[in-house]
Swiss-Prot record:
Belongs to the ketol-acid reductoisomerase family. Pathway: Amino-acid biosynthesis; L-isoleucine biosynthesis; L-isoleucine from 2-oxobutanoate: step 2/4; Amino-acid biosynthesis; L-valine biosynthesis; L-valine from pyruvate: step 2/4. It catalyses: (2R)-2,3-dihydroxy-3-methylbutanoate + NADP(+) = (2S)-2-acetolactate + NADPH + H(+); (2R,3R)-2,3-dihydroxy-3-methylpentanoate + NADP(+) = (S)-2-ethyl-2-hydroxy-3-oxobutanoate + NADPH + H(+). This is Ketol-acid reductoisomerase (NADP(+)). Substrate binds at S415. Involved in the biosynthesis of branched-chain amino acids (BCAA). Catalyzes an alkyl-migration followed by a ketol-acid reduction of (S)-2-acetolactate (S2AL) to yield (R)-2,3-dihydroxy-isovalerate. In the isomerase reaction, S2AL is rearranged via a Mg-dependent methyl migration to produce 3-hydroxy-3-methyl-2-ketobutyrate (HMKB). In the reductase reaction, this 2-ketoacid undergoes a metal-dependent reduction by NADPH to yield (R)-2,3-dihydroxy-isovalerate. Mg(2+) 1 binds at D217, E221. Residues 14-208 form the KARI N-terminal Rossmann domain. It comes from Mannheimia succiniciproducens (strain KCTC 0769BP / MBEL55E). Binds 2 magnesium ions per subunit. NADP(+) binds at C45, G46, A47, Q48, R68, R76, S78, D108, K109, Q110, G158.
């Protein structure tokens, strides 16, 4: 097998990268009816597997789980999750032959083994689904010609997919059909029905491609979503403690600060996040963000280039073959950082506004990181809608994992693929941020409020205009408006 993207000519590459269409609500008028009465078998019962399955069952679909024999006999976590929620569970041999749609929701590194095991068992003309296209695009998996291959990729962790569905909404979702595997022309109907069953059509669906989803997803998770948060957490905590701050206070400011700060992104983008600062602090955050871009933009572009070329995937798959030696070593090193071992902040109170006032450089890191990731994706041919979802939109969700159990929780919740890319980025970004940004911070940049200063009205006006007119803000306003409309529709019943 060889990297599918690299087998395409330039025109085909640009076409696949640029596949992005925001679908109309009317296109989902039939809901998930196309899949009703069909047997759907999910392989894997982790966060995405369980929660998508719960949503699909609640939408009226026939869902069961195919697990490896040892997972069943040893009653492993996947078996317990499925059975405790009342699902039928069986081996591949028991369930796959009668399945109309097999959905592969195992980790990326297991996909080739899953395909090799289930493909001979699948009936003629069945369908095969993914929620991430890595196996097709980067590994170059070849699927039987009679099988339809589709993707439904919720832009949230599995737990969020379930919680949003339970409150009558959903999460933004990308869907795609693999052009090499749509023999009956039913791929889009299957993908739409699957997305509707998970609740994705209530929040907005992008018709994309396997290529666009993979390249943008890898870029977002490696840089702003995980890598920047990890690097920022480590250097900001170290700086606070070095400046004499109580380690417990420093740990809490960082651990919960990302979540509080990025919650503003969800409601009003970078504009609202920056508006939470005083004028003096906003100016300083803007200036710090520009400095961060000067020192880190090369790294964002390198990651984008390595993702497009396939260099990243080749490097990671070599580590898979080596027993994940690098991944495990980096994971262990992260667990030993001072931030991860900061004392608990029992009794320490930090108000919502204090997280903004005492975290100006954190706000700057978020602003710079979102804009650099978005710009790098768009410059590489990825459409703005996809770039928005893979940078700004998912950030509050990842920040929430840090609030729960710091970097450990983030790296547990995200995939091994995301975790590996996170370390590649943060291992380089951390010393750069420490030397070029954090060591140069002024009073009021971190740990205490920015001192009030005389404000140049013209300078402030220009900064505000620059913030509000960045392309990520313009497309974000449009997409968030759609989601607001959808929430209003769902709340009315």
């Amino acid at each position: 097998m060889s990297n599918y993207f690299n087998t395409l000519n330039l025109r085909q590459k640009l076409d696949q990268l640029g596949r992005c269409r925001f679908m109309e609500r009317s296109e989902f008028a039939d809901g998930c009816n196309f899949l009703k009465g069909k047997k759907i078998v999910i392989v894997g019962c982790g966060a995405q597997g369980l929660n998508q399955g719960l949503n699909m069952r609640d939408s009226g679909l026939d869902i069961s789980y195919a697990l490896r024999p040892e997972a069943i006999t040893e009653k492993r976590a996947s078996f317990q999750r499925a059975t405790e929620n009342g699902f039928k569970v069986g081996t591949y041999q028991e369930l796959i032959p009668t399945a109309d749609l097999v959905v592969n929701l195992t980790p990326d590194k297991q996909h080739s083994k899953v395909v090799a095991d289930v493909m001979p068992l699948m009936k003629q003309g069945a369908s095969f689904g993914y929620s991430h296209g890595f196996n097709i695009v980067e590994v170059g998996e070849q699927i039987r010609e009679d099988i339809t291959v589709v993707m439904v990729a919720p832009k949230c962790p599995g737990t969020e997919v379930r919680e949003e569905y339970k409150r009558g909404f959903g999460v933004p979702t990308l869907i795609a059909v693999h052009p090499a595997n749509d023999p009956k022309g039913e791929g889009m109907a299957i993908a739409k029905a699957w997305a509707s069953a998970t609740g994705g059509d209530r929040a907005g669906v992008l018709e994309s491609s396997f290529v666009a989803e993979v390249k943008s997803d890898l870029m977002g998770e490696q840089t702003i979503l995980c890598g920047m948060l990890q690097a920022g957490s480590i250097v900001c905590y170290d700086k606070l403690v070095a400046d004499g701050k109580d380690p417990a206070y420093a740990g809490k400011l960082i651990q919960y600060g990302w979540e509080t700060i990025t919650e503003a992104l969800k409601q009003g983008g970078i504009t609202l996040m920056m508006d939470r600062l005083s004028n003096s602090a906003k100016i300083r955050a803007f200036e710090l963000a520009e400095e961060i871009k000067e020192h880190l933009n090369f790294l964002y572009l390198k990651h984008m280039d390595d993702i497009i070329s396939g260099e990243f995937s080749a490097t990671m798959m070599a580590d898979w073959a080596n027993g994940d030696k690098d991944l495990f070593a980096w994971r262990e090193a992260t667990g030993k950082t001072a931030f991860e071992n900061a004392p608990k902040a029992d009794g320490i109170k930090i108000s919502e506004q204090e997280y903004f006032d005492n975290g100006v450089v954190m706000v700057a890191m978020v602003k710079a990181g979102v804009e650099m990731a978005f710009d790098a994706m768009v410059a590489s041919g990825i459409y703005e809608e996809s770039a928005y979802y893979e940078s700004l939109h998912e950030l509050p969700l990842i920040a929430n994992t840090i609030a729960r159990k710091r970097l450990y929780e983030m790296n547990v919740v995200i995939s091994d693929t995301a975790e590996y890319g996170n370390y590649l980025f943060s291992n380089v970004a951390t010393p750069i941020l420490a030397k070029e940004i954090v060591s140069q911070l002024k009073r009021g940049d971190l740990g205490e409020p920015t001192p009030a200063a005389e404000i140049d009205n013209v300078y402030l006006r220009d900064i505000n205009d620059t913030i509000r007119n960045h392309p990520v803000e313009l497309i974000g306003q449009e997409l968030r408006g759609y989601m607001t409309d959808m929430k209003r529709i769902s709340s009315q019943g």
